[in-house]
Amino acid sequence: MATAGKGSKGKGTGVRFTPEGTQGHPQEGTQGHVHFQEQLHDSAVMVTQDKDGHFLVKVGFLKILHKYEITFQLPPVPNLGKDVCPLPVPNPNLRIISVTSLPEGHNVRCEYTAHKEGVLKEELLLAGHSPTHIKVTVQARVMDRHHGTPMLLDGVRCVGAELEYDSEQSDWHGFD
């Protein structure tokens, strides 16, 4: 078989940059680190309050089948008062460890298990001496195990990993 045209053209030259580099790009051979402006990257857990008085706590990226301790601060809620306690909510993935009253609000510490991929929202309820309660929704973006290790926000700490059953690593060889 003939390969017409193969090798008939000269090889093209590569792209060349001027010694000082192109605008916005470092010169070849220099370190190419990415730097973000401080105001563009907020590394703390974000707490927002909606018009109903409930809270949304965004804890950032987490890794699937890992357990995290999450600490965040809620602003003062006049309806609850100083003595706040968690209401029992049957949720195997999110449990409150402690709620501490502070002059500037309440410090909440909870344990969260990232049990599946995607944007997950888990709820917890806090109550005071009055008959009202507030709902706190913890939102996490959970990555699968093949997408690396996420940078955790301030207030989020990995405390362990759940064992994952992987059928390829099974010790059972079947019937002989």
From Swiss-Prot:
Q: Where is the composition biased (Polar residues)?
A: 20-30
Q: Which GO terms describe its cellular component?
A: extracellular space
One biological-process term from Gene Ontology? positive regulation of transforming growth factor beta receptor signaling pathway
What the entry lists under Pfam families is as follows:
DUF4517
| One Gene Ontology molecular-function label | protein phosphatase 1 binding
Q: Where is this region: Disordered?
A: 1-30
- Record's InterPro entries? ADISSP
Record's PANTHER family? ADIPOSE-SECRETED SIGNALING PROTEIN
Which function does this protein serve? May be involved in thermogenesis and glucose homeostasis.
What the record says about family reads:
Belongs to the ADISSP family.
| UniProt name for this protein | Adipose-secreted signaling protein
Give the originating organism. Answer: Taeniopygia guttata
